[in-house]
Amino acid sequence: MKPGIHPDYREVVFQDMSNGFKFITRSTIQTRETIDHEGKTYPLAKIEVSSESHSFYTGQQKIMDTAGRVEKFKNKFGARASGKVAK
């Protein structure tokens, strides 16, 4: 591989924010946060869903609206979404 053109491929801790589950894998993701895990310091990437919380893997259906997506959509597109056109 050519030096200097590839991103840094390193071990990163991914943390599922819905249940706190953490796992280490290698990634090129850029993060500002770090975490101490098993005696070492790793970059931390926070994710909303992982295999520990996704309904496909857990077998439990769960409604997740952690970011308030519906309200955010209504605030942004309220008049247009209801069929009314503002003039």
Swiss-Prot record:
GO molecular function term, any single one: structural constituent of ribosome
- Which Pfam family is one of those matched by this entry? Ribosomal_L31
Note the HAMAP family from the entry.
Ribosomal_bL31_2
- Would you tell me the protein name for this molecule? Large ribosomal subunit protein bL31B
Cysteine disulfide partners in this protein: none
Q: Which family does it belong to?
A: Belongs to the bacterial ribosomal protein bL31 family. Type B subfamily.
Q: Which organism is it from?
A: Burkholderia vietnamiensis (strain G4 / LMG 22486) (Burkholderia cepacia (strain R1808))
Q: Which UniProt keywords apply?
A: Ribonucleoprotein, Ribosomal protein
Subunit-structure text: Part of the 50S ribosomal subunit.
Cellular component GO terms held in the UniProt record: ribonucleoprotein complex; ribosome
**NCBIfam families with a match to the protein in the record:** L31, PRK01678.1
Q: Show the PANTHER family listed in the entry.
A: 50S RIBOSOMAL PROTEIN L31, CHLOROPLASTIC, LARGE RIBOSOMAL SUBUNIT PROTEIN BL31C
Q: Which InterPro entries does its entry note? A: Ribosomal_bL28/bL31-like_sf (IPR034704), Ribosomal_bL31 (IPR002150), Ribosomal_bL31_B (IPR027493), Ribosomal_bL31_sf (IPR042105)
User: Encoded by which gene?
Assistant: rpmE2
Q: Name one GO biological process term.
A: translation
